[in-house]
Amino acid sequence: MSIQVENIRKAFGDFVALNDISLNFPGGELVALLGPSGCGKTTLLRIIAGLEQADAGRVLLDGQDASATHVRERQVGFVFQHYALFRHMTVFDNVAFGLRMKPRRERPSEAEIARKVHALLDLVQLDWLADRLPAQLSGGQRQRIALARALAVEPRVLLLDEPFGALDAKVRKELRRWLRKLHDELHITSLFVTHDQEEALEVADRVVLMNHGKVEQIGSPAEVYSQPASAFVYGFLGSANRIRGVSATGAVAVGGQTLAADHQLPHGQPVEAFIRPHELAILPEHGAGLPARVQRVLTLGGLSRIELEGRDELAGQSFDAELPADAPLLAELAVGQAVRLQARAARVFAADPQGGEA
């Protein structure tokens, strides 16, 4: 089922949560609503579900205006961050709950309910836990049961609000791979809210990146990462060194040095250059580049992160560089050592005159 939101606006007092949002989600997609806390992503999800009413605008499900349709009539499955399982019910009864609550004329027989519940528990690979209580399950198992319960009523749309946010990093990684595989089997239109950039980029077909109640960019994970539409998008999607400077011909002047720019901006315009840690080369102090000093070297699995501080005109500016953990250069670096930095690539945006993100 397709979903469209048209000119949605929602405010809570003086706080504008959603400011004229229009989006189109084709049927069968798995879409991430990504952004920092307070950007409006959960409010948008709740409006689509019918759990919140928009102040203005429309929600269309398969082309039909559902703005005034009660949440029960929208045929939406909703999965919350904190499971929301009934503690006194077994896993089986939790999954069966929605089916048993249907109006009598629509309610399946107990035999049909049992068949369907066991099929769903088999789908989420937890049929062997059917007689357990939620307290006897791990966090990851509870979330899979919550998803099975949402699917039991055969929703036309599946909405997930930070479904893995309460889980530890290892379990989150396992579950997002599982969710992607499950979606590929079911092909149900699904939207999930997350503030985890890696989660959105790894799982989604498309990413909607939001900030301050507005949409910053929509695209595939590869598009939003490699072709960011704004400084906010670049800075939010992964680690980045951020340097203020002035545009020159095909370059950016920073601290008496020049960095090659990825595109032209008017000469002399204040700009911000963004450089990924793996695109920052560390050179001997007598070479050309940005003056810096090594502050710390950390080895994190197969990568080493070098934390540096700017010198001279860049005093007070922090930088991060990344190298393979077996890079020969690491043996030559010492805390306090003066070095030079050169960017292999830099993404340049016009600087926000207010000092924020452009």
Curated annotation (Swiss-Prot):
Molecular function terms, GO-annotated: ABC-type sulfate transporter activity; ABC-type thiosulfate transporter activity; ATP binding; ATP hydrolysis activity
GO CC annotations, alphabetized: ATP-binding cassette (ABC) transporter complex
Annotated ATP binding sites: G35, P36, S37, G38, C39, G40, K41, T42
Pfam families listed in its UniProt record: ABC_tran, TOBE_3
Gene3D superfamilies: P-loop containing nucleotide triphosphate hydrolases
Record PROSITE patterns: ABC_TRANSPORTER_1, ABC_TRANSPORTER_2, CYSA
Key words of the record: ATP-binding, Cell inner membrane, Cell membrane, Membrane, Nucleotide-binding, Sulfate transport, Translocase, Transport
EC number: 7.3.2.3
Domain of life of the organism encoding this protein: Bacteria
Enzyme class of the recorded protein, top EC level: translocase
Start and end residues of each ABC transporter domain: 3-237
Annotated localization: Cell inner membrane
SUPFAM superfamilies recorded: MOP-like (SSF50331), P-loop containing nucleoside triphosphate hydrolases (SSF52540)
Catalytic activity: sulfate(out) + ATP + H2O = sulfate(in) + ADP + phosphate + H(+); thiosulfate(out) + ATP + H2O = thiosulfate(in) + ADP + phosphate + H(+)
Annotated membrane topology: Peripheral membrane protein
Role played: Part of the ABC transporter complex CysAWTP involved in sulfate/thiosulfate import. Responsible for energy coupling to the transport system.
Self-association and partners: The complex is composed of two ATP-binding proteins (CysA), two transmembrane proteins (CysT and CysW) and a solute-binding protein (CysP).
Protein family: Belongs to the ABC transporter superfamily. Sulfate/tungstate importer (TC 3.A.1.6) family.
Protein name, per record: Sulfate/thiosulfate import ATP-binding protein CysA 1
Source organism of the structure: Chromobacterium violaceum (strain ATCC 12472 / DSM 30191 / JCM 1249 / CCUG 213 / NBRC 12614 / NCIMB 9131 / NCTC 9757 / MK)
